[in-house]
Amino acid sequence: TFEPGCRNNWHIHHADKGGGQILVCTAGEGVYQEWGKEPQILHPGDVVYIKPGVKHYHGAAADSWFSHIAVECPGENCSNEWCEPVTDEQYNSAKIERF
C-alpha cells in the first residue's frame, strides 16, 4: 500500500527468460509509467503486465491511497535493478481521470 503521493524509484525487472511483473490494482488510484511513455492512471480491477527489461515506476496518485498486488513472474536469472528517483515533474505529468 502506498500513501498519497508515494511512489517507488524507476526500476527494471531483468530476466534471461520469462520474468517480468504483474500489478493487480485493488484499491484507490495509482500511477504507472514506463520510461519514455505517458503515465497511466490505475484503478481497482486494472491489471498491468510489465515485460522484463522495461524501466518503470508505480505508486499512489497525489491525493489517494493506492494498493496493489505485485507478482514477480517466474523466469531464469531474474534480478531487480533500482534506478534514480522519479522526479516531481515526471510524477506530476499524470492526469487523474475521475469516474
PLM region spans:
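A short beta-strand-loop-beta hairpin characteristic of the jelly-roll/cupin
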Residues: 7, 17-44, 54
